[in-house]
């Protein structure tokens, strides 16, 4: 993630509008070489008779590494060249994407397709075009969907696809190898007490850790969820009853309050670029993040930053009391709104992006920034060419999701969007609330969405 997050990039990729003489049904055009390391079945694509005069408007999250946008733009331009359908793509800052999605959904106007956040489709399901035809085709062709992709793409406990996960963003531990060794560790411990000791020692040697406890869409929610799950706590139980009022949540809050003492000051104000900047500046030695930090350092012309990349390692977040390392991968989730005049063109655009000639290079060049929702893409060679990418490979092969361990619903989305859990941790860590009072506040807010038991 980079300092360019607040910059809104807009690119209109031209192409002649479809003529009035008639619009063909588009098949599976392969305008780029198909990657040879993506296993695929011979499956006939669904046929979408594209609407006359179709033109699309799309919004998606702003990039944190250049290839994410560069290859998205290349693929979009290729789609226009192949089909004649012009597509306008707007790249929206992470903080603004949810509000803009809400406006589009509530006004019934604006972008045809929103590549939005993980569970937001559950808020707007009645306003979305179903995706079963696309999901079934892609799943059959590319080895099936990872379970977490199915959870985010389908109505809870049904086979109805309301959205299509495009790629998951995960946040494993990112750390400086030499500084962690200086603190007495060869790797990041899974035991929470040992992890606390490591962070304390990093602070003592002048290289503190740093985790966002502010309103950072990805980083803060990811850290707060880890803190809950690693201590055996959860927002709701499997039946969807709010379960925050527990001894496990108290333990999680006390743990983060102690950990906060060893963090660099100011993490309460960090957005999703805060830890990136601090790490690249050499101000912190450990954080949780996507691959963007490593990617920027590795590809910098600055020898100092290149040396930092060599001294950087990734590892799954500490397991603590969880069944396995409690890391999720929140996907960028494609939503096609019913107000679109060109739903078939929109579906064809999404299908085109997910096919191997387009998706393979985009995924590989993003270098772990996004993790694949379709199993065949996990076979691509780039995942094993750099061992430092290992924690990002198969990141969507996880049991953890927003709202774990309950149903994924509009309530789960609202809790995340309103930073209910993040604010609970922040209040205790900064000394503005006791664990018990912070839990009461969080429970009241969560019950506004989930209802009372």
Model-derived features with residue positions:
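Glycine-centered hinge/linker elements that transmit conformational signals in sensory
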Residues: 198-205, 239-268, 313, 317
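Hinge/lid segment of periplasmic solute-binding proteins
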Residues: 32-50, 117-172, 196, 309-315
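C-terminal lobe and pocket-closing loops
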Residues: 41-43, 48-50, 119, 292-308, ...
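Short, solvent-exposed loop/beta-turn-alpha elements that line the ligand-binding surface or hinge
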Residues: 46-51, 132-148, 231-252, 299-312, ...
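N-terminal secretory signal peptides and thylakoid transit peptides that target proteins
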Residues: 1-18
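Extracytoplasmic/periplasmic solute-binding protein
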Residues: 153-166, 171, 196-242, 248, ...
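Conserved C-terminal helix/tail region of periplasmic/extracytoplasmic solute-binding proteins
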Residues: 33-38, 42, 50-51, 86-87, ...
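Extracytoplasmic "Venus flytrap"/periplasmic binding protein-like
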Residues: 74-146, 178-190, 278, 282-286, ...
């Amino acid at each position: 993630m980079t300092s360019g997050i607040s910059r809104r990039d807009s690119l209109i990729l031209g192409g002649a509008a479809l003529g009035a003489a008639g619009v063909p049904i588009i098949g599976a055009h392969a305008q780029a070489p198909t990657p040879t390391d993506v296993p695929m079945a011979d499956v006939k694509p669904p046929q979408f008779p594209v609407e006359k005069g179709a033109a699309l408007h799309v919004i998606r999250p702003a990039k944190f590494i250049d290839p994410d946008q560069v290859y998205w733009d290349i693929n979009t331009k290729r789609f226009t060249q192949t089909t004649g359908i012009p597509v306008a793509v707007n790249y929206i800052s992470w903080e603004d994407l949810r509000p803009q999605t809400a406006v589009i959904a509530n006004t019934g106007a604006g972008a045809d397709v929103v590549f939005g956040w993980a569970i937001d489709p559950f808020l707007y399901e009645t306003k979305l075009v179903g995706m079963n035809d696309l999901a079934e085709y892609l799943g059959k062709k590319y080895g099936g969907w990872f379970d977490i992709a199915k959870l985010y793409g389908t109505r809870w406990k049904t086979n109805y696809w309301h959205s299509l996960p495009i790629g998951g963003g995960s946040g494993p531990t990112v750390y400086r190898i030499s500084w962690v060794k200086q603190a007495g560790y060869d790797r990041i411990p899974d035991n929470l007490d040992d992890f606390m000791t490591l962070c304390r020692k990093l602070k003592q040697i002048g290289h503190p850790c740093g985790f966002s406890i502010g309103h950072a869409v990805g980083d803060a929610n990811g850290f707060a969820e880890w803190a809950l799950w690693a201590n055996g706590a959860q927002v709701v139980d499997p039946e969807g009853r709010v379960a925050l009022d527990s001894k496990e949540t108290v333990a999680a809050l006390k743990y983060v309050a102690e950990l906060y003492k060893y963090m660099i000051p100011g993490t309460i104000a960090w957005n999703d670029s805060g830890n990136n900047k601090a790490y690249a500046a050499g101000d912190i030695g450990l954080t949780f993040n996507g691959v963007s930090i490593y990617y920027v350092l590795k590809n910098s012309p600055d020898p100092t930053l290149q040396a930092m990349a060599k001294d950087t390692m990734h590892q799954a977040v500490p397991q603590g009391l969880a069944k396995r390392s409690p890391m999720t991968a929140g996907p960028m989730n494609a939503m096609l709104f019913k107000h679109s005049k060109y739903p078939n063109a929109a579906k064809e655009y999404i299908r085109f992006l997910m096919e191997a000639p387009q998706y393979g290079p985009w995924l590989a060049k993003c270098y772990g920034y996004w993790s694949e929702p379709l199993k065949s893409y996990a076979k691509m060679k780039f995942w094993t060419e750099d061992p430092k990418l290992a924690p990002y490979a198969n990141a969507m092969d996880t049991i953890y999701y927003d709202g774990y361990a309950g149903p994924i619903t509009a309530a789960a989305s609202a809790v995340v969007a309103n930073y209910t859990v993040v604010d609970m941790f922040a209040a205790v860590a900064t000394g503005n609330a006791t664990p018990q009072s912070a839990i009461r506040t969080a429970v009241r807010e969560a019950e506004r969405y989930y209802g009372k038991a």
